[in-house]
UniProtKB/Swiss-Prot annotation:
Ribonucleoprotein listed as a keyword: yes
Protein name in the entry: Large ribosomal subunit protein bL32
Record keywords, A-Z: Ribonucleoprotein, Ribosomal protein
Comp. bias intervals (Basic residues): 1-18
HAMAP family found in the cross-reference section: Ribosomal_bL32
GO biological process, alphabetically ordered: translation
Cellular compartments per GO CC: large ribosomal subunit
Taxonomic source organism: Chlorobium phaeovibrioides (strain DSM 265 / 1930) (Prosthecochloris vibrioformis (strain DSM 265))
PANTHER family hit by this protein: 50S RIBOSOMAL PROTEIN L32, LARGE RIBOSOMAL SUBUNIT PROTEIN BL32
The keyword Ribonucleoprotein is assigned to this record: yes
Amino acid sequence: MAHPKAKVSKSRRDKRRAQFNARTKAATTVNCPNCGEPTLPHRACRHCGHYRGRAVVAKAANS
C-alpha cells in the first residue's frame, strides 16, 4: 500500500486543491440592474459604474 514519503503541510495541500477548483468552476455572473450587462456579483459594474443602485465609479457619458 502506498504511503507518503514526507508530510504535506496544510498550506501545500490547499494550494494543490485550489488549482483543481479554479479549473472546474465557472465564474458566476449576474446582470446589472442598471444597464443589463453581465457583471460579477458583489462588485461595481464595469460598464456603467453602478453598485446597489448608486454610481460608485465615475464613467464617461459616451461609454
